[in-house]
Amino acid sequence: MNALTARPVPQPPALIAHADWSTNPKKRAIARALRMADGSYTALTPEPVSGLPDLFARLRAAAGAGGTALMGFDFPLGLPRAHAKAARIDRFVPTLRQLGRGSWKAFYDPAEDASQISVRRPFYPQRPGGTKRQHLIDALGLSGAQDLFRHCDRPTDLRGAASPLFWTLGAQQVGKAAISGWRDLIAPALRSDPSLRIWPFDGRLAEMLSQPGIVIAETYPSEFYGHLGLQIAVSNKSKLNPAHRRDDAGRLLDWAARNEIRLSGALTADIRDGFGTGPDGEDRFDATIGLFGMLNVVLGQRVQGEPADPVVRRIEGWILGL
């Protein structure tokens, strides 16, 4: 499904940014790297995402007049093909503009019980207690558990399977983050700015980065752990543990040096310190990992992951670098 050869993008973006997302605004962090006059990148320490209404305007300003920004988010962008077929959805992005409105008004409201689940209200459950993924499978008319997943959600040689989009319980669930990201940020931005582009739905990455504006991509920091050779990917390690984050400091600093990425003094200090012991440490860590993983792709150290399957390109979406 992927390109077999990694190569740098022909026109690297002026700005690369990655947001570690959460339903809690206080747990959202964004890391950025700016392209310098000599063509190298300088990476900055993560900051709070802050206000959503002007986020893309701030990215445009940082990229400069006529510049391009590549923005990564670690929530799903796309729908499982079985659900799309049942809901008669042919393209994800045009549908995303409509979700939460009209006949899709209840889309973002997680079903309180199995009887409320439908193709137009697929997120479940609203709260724990007597809930099963089988309820989703049955109510959506799916053939089995595999139909809850997009192809890019399936396990790879570097990680286990991602959580299915519509499931909203548990530490690994992504449903609530997708609701927040789509409803509160991406969909409103698409409705107000048709020039906003989402990879891979709106074209190949290299082609989109050759044009001014903002390109959005889905990322998965847990996948990037393996791309960057981090020990935190090992089963007995956790990003929640500051000591485990510190254990990978040397590997992150070495990766940046090998790829001629300049790090701000604050980012260097944060990496060495494992991003501190505060509750936002894991968020700032993953924001940085996401940024480095995106740089890895842009610089040609990792395949972009251009999917060949037309259903993936129209409906399911893909994870950058997979």
Walk through the language-model features, giving the residues of each.
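RNase H-like (RuvC/DEDD) metal-dependent nuclease/polynucleotide-processing core
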Residues: 2-17, 21-322
